[in-house]
Structures are given as structure tokens and as C-alpha cells.
A protein has these predicted regions:
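An alpha-helical, amphipathic repeat domain used for nucleic-acid recognition
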Residues: 1-143
Length: 143
């Protein structure tokens, strides 16, 4: 299969950043120049778009994860720092509501004791929610 065909197959499954495609296709390319040419061509035809990658990750992950976890995933995809920062800033506004919804699905009722409260807080922290959002969600549940 041609390099361009492989790239299109990856892109048909989901949005990929240029850096992700470089990593995945490097083993199949005859030369780095050939790989760069294919990726330049795909980018010129708008098959590769950082904005769509960011939007895709946010749509898939925002309901289950906090801004820190999503930031880490976006950085791992090799996206521009400005695009990552913009996406994370847009998520910060709804952080408490999203954390509350994740907490409600997992626990649904206030913690009975300090150990249970710690477990709930650690769960939300592992999901990438900020400490302020976690404190607000867990303390409001007890009220």
C-alpha cells in the first residue's frame, strides 16, 4: 500500500495531527523527504487540520476528563502549544460542571467518612480535574 493510502486510511478512522502521522508512517516511508512530501500534500488539501484534531479530542473526552488530562493528550499528539492552550482555556469554564457530572455518575451520594471522601477526590484528580473543581464538587455534595 502506498504511503498516501496508509495516511488516508488513518485519517478515515479519526483525525490525526501531522506529528501522529509522521510517527505512524515513518517505518513505511522510503525516505524522510517522501514522508514530508505526502504530509505536505495532505495538509495542502486540508486532510490534516490541527483545529479538527483539537475539536475531535474535546468532543470525545470533555464529558469524562478534566482539562489537565485533555491537555496532556493534546500535547502528546504534537499539536502547537497555542492550540492546546486555547482548547484548555475553553474547558476551564465548564470544569466544575463536568467534574460534578463525572462524580454523580460514579458515586451519586456524599461520602460517608473521610476515607470515602478521599477516594472520591482521588478519582476526580486521576480524571484530570483541578483541585479547586474537585473541592467544590465534593464539598457541595455534602451540603
Amino acid at each position: 500500500m502506498s504511503l498516501k493510502g496508509r495516511a488516508l486510511r488513518y485519517l478515515a478512522a479519526r483525525e490525526h495531527s501531522r506529528a501522529e502521522l509522521e510517527r505512524k508512517l515513518a517505518a513505511h516511508a522510503e525516505s524522510p523527504e517522501q514522508l514530508a512530501q505526502v504530509l505536505d500534500d495532505l495538509q495542502a488539501k486540508d486532510f490534516i487540520s490541527e483545529a479538527r484534531v483539537v475539536e475531535s479530542v474535546i468532543n470525545r473526552r470533555a464529558g469524562r476528563f478534566g482539562a489537565a488530562r485533555i491537555r496532556h493528550e493534546l500535547q502528546g499528539k504534537g499539536l502547537a502549544p497555542e492550540a492546546v492552550a486555547g482548547a484548555v482555556n475553553s474547558l476551564k469554564a465548564s470544569e466544575v460542571e463536568r467534574a460534578r457530572e463525572v462524580w454523580r455518575k460514579k458515586f451519586g451520594e456524599p461520602a460517608a467518612d473521610a476515607a470515602a471522601r478521599g477516594k472520591q477526590m482521588r478519582f476526580l484528580a486521576a480524571r484530570g480535574f483541578g483541585s479547586e473543581a474537585i473541592r467544590r464538587v465534593v464539598s457541595q455534595a455534602e451540603d
